């Protein structure tokens, strides 16, 4: 199978912009690029259009790499860049809880394509949380906030997503959340 040009370009850009970043894990050093690739794969597996898969691969570059929406639009296209902006948390709010609360407000107004990307993102992150918990019972601190607040946030994101989109990823997110609540 040949990957579409837009998806290949997204992989190239994400590889450059995430270079040197690592995933949060108590024992293993996992290059960060593994996460955007997982998100893109999940989106492709449910038949998302190429620009949505590309935005999924690039979903963290505005938030974590200092890339602007304009720079991203020039590098790939405006539609993809707009989706990445929709799934990016506000950079100017430093407090974890306030940032998450503000993001939930913006997520409640997000497009269905952005919600699908956020769902794939959370599926990947929940899988990582479950795997990391096997190595360290104190995994919650690594993923921001304490257990109670992190779980509340994950449940709130899932609640918003399941009200607005139908996808096998939503059911997978629910299944992973059920496992995470037992950690």
Q: Residue ranges of each PLM-predicted region?
A:
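Active-site helical microenvironments for divalent-metal-assisted chemistry
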Residues: 1-183
């Amino acid at each position: 199978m040949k990957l579409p040009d837009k998806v290949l370009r997204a992989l190239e850009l994400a590889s450059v912009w995430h270079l040197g970043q690592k995933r949060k894990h108590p024992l293993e050093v996992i290059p960060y690029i593994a996460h955007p690739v997982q998100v893109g794969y999940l989106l492709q597996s449910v038949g998302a259009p190429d620009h949505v898969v590309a935005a999924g691969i690039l979903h963290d570059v505005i938030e974590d790499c200092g890339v602007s929406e304009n720079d991203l639009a020039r590098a790939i296209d405006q539609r993809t860049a707009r989706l990445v902006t929709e799934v990016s948390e506000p950079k100017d709010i430093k407090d974890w809880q306030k940032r998450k609360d503000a993001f939930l407000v913006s997520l409640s107004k997000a497009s269905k394509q952005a919600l699908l990307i956020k769902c794939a993102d959370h599926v990947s992150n929940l899988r990582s949380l479950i795997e990391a918990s096997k190595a360290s019972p104190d995994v919650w601190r690594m993923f921001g906030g304490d257990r109670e607040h992190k779980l509340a946030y994950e449940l709130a994101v899932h609640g918003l997503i399941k009200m607005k989109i139908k996808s096998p990823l939503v059911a997978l997110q629910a299944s992973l959340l059920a496992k995470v609540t037992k950690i």
